[in-house]
């Protein structure tokens, strides 16, 4: 009942608002004319975005391919140790190729110099320090990759040591290498998510 009364009371107010004179449209704003420097900057940004998109596509394609492989059982039809070892060696090669494609694309994205807006000084120094440059980005990426490779090698060497006396050693090392590379791909995808997907 209250709703009906409220609706009936609002009808005249809404009708009056619709029939009230509308303000005259404001004059159109003059179109901004870009300077030659701004036009050049826009062209440089278009090239930058196109290169960035190609590299992001390459990285995400390699990542997606490896994540699909990760969901499948590695070597489901291999039963003998020899067959398992051959299969895992092949699986490691494919994973390594996807890993190299992903990291090469991410590193190339980090190395892309972003065009500077006319009149802007670079690198910008913010409250926490200077902004990253292609040189600092790639140096940090290379250092992290070198540290990770050393860690992965040490981890799989420890697995090798544990299983050295048995015929299973090569399979265990193969699984270790697959696990380490895929875990690292997840880490890198998370670390560079904003670069890859935005």
Spans of features found by a protein language model:
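N-terminal alpha-helical modules
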Residues: 18-198
């Amino acid at each position: 009942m209250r709703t009906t009364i409220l609706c009936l009371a609002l009808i005249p107010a809404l009708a009056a608002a619709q029939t009230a004179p509308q303000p005259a449209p404001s004059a159109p704003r003059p179109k901004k004319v870009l300077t030659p420097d701004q036009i050049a900057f826009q062209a440089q940004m278009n090239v930058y975005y196109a290169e960035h998109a190609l590299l992001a596509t390459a990285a995400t394609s390699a990542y997606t391919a490896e994540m699909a492989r990760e969901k499948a059982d590695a070597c489901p039809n291999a039963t003998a140790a020899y067959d398992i070892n051959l299969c895992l060696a092949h699986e490691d090669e494919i994973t390594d190729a996807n890993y190299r494609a992903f990291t090469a694309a991410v590193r190339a994205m980090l190395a892309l110099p972003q065009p500077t807006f006319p009149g802007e000084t670079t690198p910008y120094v913010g409250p926490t320090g200077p902004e990253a440059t292609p040189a600092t980005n790639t140096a940090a990426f290379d250092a992290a990759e070198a540290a990770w490779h050393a860690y992965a090698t040490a981890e799989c060497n420890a697995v090798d040591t544990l299983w050295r006396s048995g015929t299973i050693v090569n399979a265990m090392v193969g699984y270790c290498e697959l696990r380490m590379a895929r875990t690292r791909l997840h880490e890198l995808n998370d670390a560079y998510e904003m670069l890859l997907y935005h």
